[in-house]
């Protein structure tokens, strides 16, 4: 066996240079082969890549290299999601301009990514902070405005008091800003919004077409869109208790069947009726002020203690005007959802039950489970939300829930209040329009001018892009564009008078909602897309990224392709940007805590193993270290591993192989030094194996032998079986399964080499074929090693340009088959026989089985039924 070691430090830069020189990963838009577009979510240029990047981009690269080998015109680009708050924070903390900080980080991260050997088309690279990119984003904003998909409206918005910017509802997590962690406040402000709700039903329906998306992501989007069918009901207000001018309270409910269980009404703190009540009652006003300081995230509202205050206003039951319901301002009702008002039926809604138990309002069950005595059915601490029949509901008693809903709807549709129906069937959506205005400097400027005479004026297309000024100061909190002495002062393009620019910039999620389309032709200076190119190259066939983007980025991107179609910039099948989506798991690592409570990094400790016990000590001084739980790699826990260190020590191929081999790709991968060392040993083993096979391959006949002996045929079957299984794994993105088959086949080939000192010509030919196949199998995962091995085997060109080997179907057929055996219809065992065995031979093998003899006992065999290649049934 060869003792020569593979030198990754020498090999990897060499092959990367050859790939770049040959431009083999550049994609031609005029290439008419079938396209395949693979894309990993582009990174934010924080300054360093982490092991999560290595895993994510390696997965995409395996897909790209495999599809390229299969003859597709592969598009595999890379860019930078470059706007955002960290650049402004760096400007404040380090006194460096956001632009300089961002582009310095891009240069550093690009250099790191290039050491990974990714098959990227770098010619298409752009950053979203490039004016040449956001020029087109501004153009699309104006085009969306023309077709009614952009509006300006005054809204109660989530205000982050630390970052001093507005956040979308999705960016409020547990009542706190997703970046700053500050408690979010509600403020009324002017806001530019994208009308995503116009596509609510379409976005919901189209989820059923996304059969290559994870079910959990589709469910998350389905729940976020939140379609519900129900009834809009108008409750008359008791004039004796109601502020002047208020006559009714409108609510939306999906459970009109429970109206006779109503015990209270509840309204949001910013509902007009609440404001009217607050004007008369200081206690109500104080409660409303307290509500405004609380979080707005649905999860926090659902888990917070239910609180309210009685306004003194009374609403009349729509079926009985003498039945008066108290109207509360409640902390669990939001103006953004439905009408900002509800009726509470505590017996059948846990939230409502918690509320009435707190304020002693009582409850009346109106749905009784089947088979239970209505007279004894009571609700105490747990609401009943199951099926049953109506009770305590007058004319609804005895009906099913479905029947009761229909009866209530019919009656309220015909009843009148103020000349309009009391009830109206309605479809409601949880989804709200996307507020994109952000009070930050480092973002895409909104191309609008505010004129005291002409009001809102779009920036003319000829004046795009509206470029960010670079001479800004961050000495004051808030938006640096507001403080700039000259940038915002302009002449109105409509009347020529003095005007000011819009100083809000776009939410950075806008930047990432269409970048995938721009990659199809980033050289177009006149328009965001080139229609014939984008329509041919889109959708993305395989998109890879984190599940944390399930709602924000992925939903916004789905809206954007539809908006771009409405504006004439794209027209693709199903209007969906991503045909296939894969959400990879995280990279996790043990944590290590020193005696003083501070965390230690993996580079600072030594691990020793004594039997089943692992101990950690500091390299400096030998002090014991507590081995903590396995957690997501993070700077705060200091459990990160620097990709540069791993690549510098072991090589990129080792890092790539380990990231793919340890666990299913949709699950977290536990980083371990032992695992990386194991991957490195496998790299060296493959290198030695190929070098051992090279002389045999060189001596093998050029022409395919007319026939193959048993050893050669066995090896060829293993090779073609591996081809089939590895490709199947890659197609299913089950990379760890593919790698296991590569290991298995390498063992088979290694055994054949060990037995074949002077192989026959047919076996030598099979060894050459099998070794070439092995190299092509691991090429997508370890491309540098594959190129080196390709050369050793005397193959021409680059393995990165070689076509995937053709599988010979005959070699996938097993010589033997295993058939289930039944005795009198009950399975008793299995029998393995040659595939072409005659019926008599199969019968004899079956009757010789101990399990069959035992099942028959003393009974004679009446007949044996053999269903060819399916099953055998013995009748006794």
Curated annotation (Swiss-Prot):
Motif 'HIGH' region, which positions?
A: 43-53
| Cellular compartments annotated | Cytoplasm
Under InterPro entries, the record lists: aa-tRNA-synth_I_CS, aa-tRNA-synth_Ia, Leu-tRNA-ligase, Leu_tRNA-synth_edit, M/V/L/I-tRNA-synth_anticd-bd, Methionyl/Leucyl_tRNA_Synth, Rossmann-like_a/b/a_fold, tRNAsynth_Ia_anticodon-bd
Q: Which UniProt keywords apply?
A: Aminoacyl-tRNA synthetase, ATP-binding, Cytoplasm, Ligase, Nucleotide-binding, Protein biosynthesis
Q: Name one GO molecular function term.
A: ATP binding
Motif 'KMSKS' region: where?
632-636
User: By its UniProt entry, which Gene3D superfamilies does this protein fall under?
Assistant: 2.20.28.290, 3.10.20.590, HUPs (3.40.50.620), Isoleucyl-tRNA Synthetase, Domain 1 (1.10.730.10)
Q: Name one Pfam family in it.
A: tRNA-synt_1g
EC class, as a word, reads ligase
Q: Name one GO cellular component term.
A: cytosol
**CDD domains, alphabetized:** Anticodon_Ia_Leu_BEm, LeuRS_core
Ligand binding (ATP): 635
Its GO biological process terms?
leucyl-tRNA aminoacylation
Describe the reaction catalysed, as an equation: tRNA(Leu) + L-leucine + ATP = L-leucyl-tRNA(Leu) + AMP + diphosphate
EC number(s) reported in the record: 6.1.1.4
- UniProt superkingdom: Bacteria
Which NCBIfam families does the UniProt entry name for this protein?
leuS_bact
- Family to which this protein belongs: Belongs to the class-I aminoacyl-tRNA synthetase family.
List, alphabetically, the PANTHER family matched.
LEUCINE--TRNA LIGASE, MITOCHONDRIAL, LEUCYL-TRNA SYNTHETASE
Mind telling me what this protein is named?
Leucine--tRNA ligase
- Look up and give the organism this protein is from: Rhodopseudomonas palustris (strain TIE-1)
- What gene is behind this protein? leuS
């Amino acid at each position: 066996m060869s003792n020569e070691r593979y030198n990754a430090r020498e090999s990897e830069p060499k092959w990367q240079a050859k790939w770049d020189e040959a431009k083999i990963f550049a994609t031609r838009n005029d290439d008419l082969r079938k396209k395949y577009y693979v894309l990993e979510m582009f990174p934010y240029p924080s300054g360093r890549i982490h092991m999560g990047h290595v895993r994510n981009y390696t997965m995409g690269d395996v897909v790209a290299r495999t599809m390229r080998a299969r003859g597709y015109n592969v598009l595999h680009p890379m860019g930078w999601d470059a706007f955002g708050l960290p650049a402004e924070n760096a400007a404040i903390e380090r006194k460096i301009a956001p632009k300089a900080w961002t582009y310095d980080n891009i240069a550093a991260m690009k250099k790191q990514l290039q050491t990974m050997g990714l098959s990227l088309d770098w010619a298409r690279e752009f950053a979203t902070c490039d004016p040449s990119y956001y020029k087109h984003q501004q153009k699309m904003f104006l085009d969306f405005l023309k077709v009614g998909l952009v509006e300006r409206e005054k809204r109660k918005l989530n205000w982050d008091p630390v970052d001093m910017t507005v956040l979308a509802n999705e960016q409020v997590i547990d009542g706190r800003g997703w970046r700053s962690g500050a408690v979010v406040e509600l403020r009324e402000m002017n806001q530019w919004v994208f009308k995503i709700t116009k596509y609510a039903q379409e976005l919901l329906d189209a989820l059923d077409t996304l059969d290559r998306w994870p079910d959990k992501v589709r469910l998350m989007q389905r729940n976020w869109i939140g379609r519900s069918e129900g009834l809009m009901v108008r409750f008359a207000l008791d004039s004796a208790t109601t502020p002047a001018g208020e006559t009714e309270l409108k609510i939306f409910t999906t459970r009109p069947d429970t109206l006779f269980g109503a015990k209270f009404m509840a309204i949001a703190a910013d509902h007009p009726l609440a404001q009217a009540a607050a004007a008369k009652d200081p206690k109500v006003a104080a409660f409303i002020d307290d509500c405004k300081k609380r979080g707005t995230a649905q999860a926090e509202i659902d888990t917070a203690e239910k609180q309210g205050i009685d306004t003194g206003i009374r609403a009349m039951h729509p079926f009985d005007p003498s039945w008066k319901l108290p109207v509360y301002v409640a902390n669990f009702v939001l103006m953004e959802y439905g009408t900002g008002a509800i009726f509470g039926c505590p017996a059948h809604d846990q939230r409502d039950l918690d509320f009435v138990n707190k304020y002693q309002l009582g409850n009346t069950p109106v749905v009784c489970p089947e088979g239970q005595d209505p007279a004894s059915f009571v609700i105490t601490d747990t609401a009943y939300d199951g099926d049953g029949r109506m009770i305590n509901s007058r004319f609804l008693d005895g009906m099913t829930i479905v029947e009761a809903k229909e009866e209530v709807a019919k009656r309220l549709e015909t009843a009148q209040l103020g000349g309009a129906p009391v009830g109206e069937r309605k479809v409601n959506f949880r989804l709200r329009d996307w507020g994109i205005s952000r009070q930050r400097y480092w973002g895409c400027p909104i191309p609008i001018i505010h004129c005291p005479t002409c009001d809102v004026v779009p920036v003319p297309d000829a004046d795009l892009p509206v470029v960010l000024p670079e001479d800004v100061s961050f000495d004051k909190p808030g938006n640096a564009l507001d403080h700039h002495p000259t940038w915002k002062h302009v002449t109105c393009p409509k009347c020529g008078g003095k005007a000011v620019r819009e100083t809000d910039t776009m939410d950075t999620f806008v930047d990432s909602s269409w970048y995938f389309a721009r990659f199809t032709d980033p050289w177009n200076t006149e328009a965001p897309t080139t229609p014939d190119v984008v329509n041919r190259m889109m959708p993305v066939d395989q998109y890879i990224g984190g599940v944390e983007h399930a709602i924000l980025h992925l939903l916004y991107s789905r809206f954007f392709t539809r908006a771009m179609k409405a504006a004439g910039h794209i027209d693709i099948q199903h209007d969906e940007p991503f045909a296939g989506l894969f959400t990879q798991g995280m990279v996790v690592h043990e944590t290590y805590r020193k005696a003083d409570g501070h965390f230690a990094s993996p580079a600072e400790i030594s691990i020793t193993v004594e039997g089943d016990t692992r101990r950690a000590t500091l390299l400096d001084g030998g002090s014991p270290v507590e081995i903590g739980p396995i957690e997501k790699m993070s700077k705060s826990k200091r459990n990160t591993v620097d990709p540069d260190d791993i690549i510098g020590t072991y090589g990129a191929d080792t890092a790539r192989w380990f990231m793919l081999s340890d666990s299913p790709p949709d699950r977290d991968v536990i980083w371990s030094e032992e695992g990386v060392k194991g991957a490195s040993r496998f790299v060296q083993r493959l290198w030695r194996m190929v070098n051992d096979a090279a002389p045999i391959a060189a001596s093998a006949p050029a022409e395919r032998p007319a026939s193959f002996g048993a050893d050669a045929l066995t090896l060829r079957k293993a090779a073609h079986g591996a081809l089939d299984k590895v490709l199947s794994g890659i197609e299913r993105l089950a990379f760890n399964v593919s790698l296991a088959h590569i290991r298995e086949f390498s063992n088979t080939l290694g055994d054949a080499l060990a037995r074949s000192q002077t192989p026959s010509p047919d076996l030598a030919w099979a060894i050459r074929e099998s070794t070439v196949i092995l190299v092509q199998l691991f090429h997508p995962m370890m491309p540098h090693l594959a190129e080196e091995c390709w050369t050793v085997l005397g193959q021409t060109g680059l393995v990165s340009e070689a076509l995937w080997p053709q599988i010979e179907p005959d070699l996938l057929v097993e010589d033997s088959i295993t058939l289930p055996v039944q005795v009198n219809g009950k399975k008793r065992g299995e029998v393995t026989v040659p595939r072409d065995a005659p019926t008599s031979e199969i019968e004899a093998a079956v009757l010789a089985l101990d399990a069959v003899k035992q099942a028959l006992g003393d009974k004679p065999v009446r007949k044996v039924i053999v269903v060819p290649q399916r099953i055998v049934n013995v009748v006794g």
